[in-house]
């Protein structure tokens, strides 16, 4: 499977997935028509399918035009069918389906929105997490609760460490600076932050990254880490309390 990643709008990631065996191409979300058109033209691919992660405008704005031009079929969360225009097929929580020759899981990951989905290709170990999980961060809780988001992240953490993570936004630099305030002595985080700053200085993208690397560096996946709990003065707090405090601090960072 081939992947084309590019920047849309200001800081959205556009992602195209091409299944070589079937010749089919899918987009993860539809943030901007022009950038997606250009990427398809660059690779000489035709768009067949769009997988929507959630209903926010910056992820669905180009649906109408892409459907009109390519006659693409749009899949998205059943829980948000009344908020996403142009949906052709709805997906239930943790539904299994096929894209070309590849099996795909639509994982229910509420928190950022109540119906948010993350798409996982188990054979290729590829995760497209939308705005649920970012590199060194996670999505804001616009609709869901801290408990819901924590449970969603725990679900994603069960995937193999070698899984490659793609997400909805290039937020990694700011996330790295925040992560260092909570976990300043984490050498793996220090190395990742240095790498991120170097990449962004060259206007290069910071994803994909392995899930294993995120588990070692992302404070939103490290609610059990003794050093982070000590820095928060929350040694004996619950996972939910620690996660909620980290999210609160990031919101105000």
From Swiss-Prot:
InterPro entries: Clx_II_MBL (IPR035680), Glyoxalase_II_hydrolase (IPR050110), HAGH_C (IPR032282), Hydroxyacylglutathione_Hdrlase (IPR017782), Metallo-B-lactamas (IPR001279), RibonucZ/Hydroxyglut_hydro (IPR036866). GO terms for biological process: methylglyoxal catabolic process to D-lactate via S-lactoyl-glutathione. It catalyses: an S-(2-hydroxyacyl)glutathione + H2O = a 2-hydroxy carboxylate + glutathione + H(+). Its EC number is 3.1.2.6. Pathway: Secondary metabolite metabolism; methylglyoxal degradation; (R)-lactate from methylglyoxal: step 2/2. GO terms for molecular function: hydroxyacylglutathione hydrolase activity; metal ion binding. Keywords: Hydrolase, Metal-binding, Zinc. Binds 2 Zn(2+) ions per subunit. Signal peptide: none annotated. It holds the Pfam family HAGH_C. Zn(2+) 2 binds at residues 58-59, 131, 169. Zn(2+) 1 binds at residues 54, 56, 112, 131. Its cofactor is Zn(2+). Monomer. NCBIfam families: GSH_gloB. Thiolesterase that catalyzes the hydrolysis of S-D-lactoyl-glutathione to form glutathione and D-lactic acid. Belongs to the metallo-beta-lactamase superfamily. Glyoxalase II family. This is Hydroxyacylglutathione hydrolase.
């Amino acid at each position: 499977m081939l992947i084309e990643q590019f920047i849309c709008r200001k800081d959205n990631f556009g992602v195209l997935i091409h299944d070589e065996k079937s010749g089919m191409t899918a987009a993860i979300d539809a943030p901007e028509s022009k950038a997606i058109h250009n990427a398809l033209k660059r690779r000489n691919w035709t768009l067949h399918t769009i997988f929507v992660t959630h209903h926010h405008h910056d992820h669905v704005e180009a649906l109408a035009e892409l459907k009109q031009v390519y006659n693409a079929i749009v899949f998205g969360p059943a829980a948000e069918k009344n908020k996403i225009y142009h949906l052709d097929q709805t997906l239930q929580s943790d539904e299994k389906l096929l894209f070309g020759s590849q099996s795909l899981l639509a994982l229910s990951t509420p928190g950022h929105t109540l119906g948010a989905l993350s798409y996982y290709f188990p054979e290729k170990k590829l995760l497209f997490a939308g705005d649920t999980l970012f590199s060194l961060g996670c999505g804001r809780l616009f609709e869901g609760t801290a408990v819901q988001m924590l449970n969603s992240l725990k679900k994603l953490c069960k995937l193999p460490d070698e899984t490659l993570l793609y997400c909805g936004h290039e937020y990694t630099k700011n996330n790295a600076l925040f992560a260092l305030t909570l976990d300043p002595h984490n050498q793996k985080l220090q190395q990742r932050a240095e790498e991120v700053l170097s990449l962004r200085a060259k206007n290069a993208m910071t994803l994909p990254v392995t899930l294993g690397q995120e588990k070692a560096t992302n404070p939103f996946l490290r609610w059990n880490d003794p050093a982070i709990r000590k820095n928060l003065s929350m040694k004996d707090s619950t996972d939910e309390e620690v996660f909620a405090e980290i999210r609160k601090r990031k919101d105000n960072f």
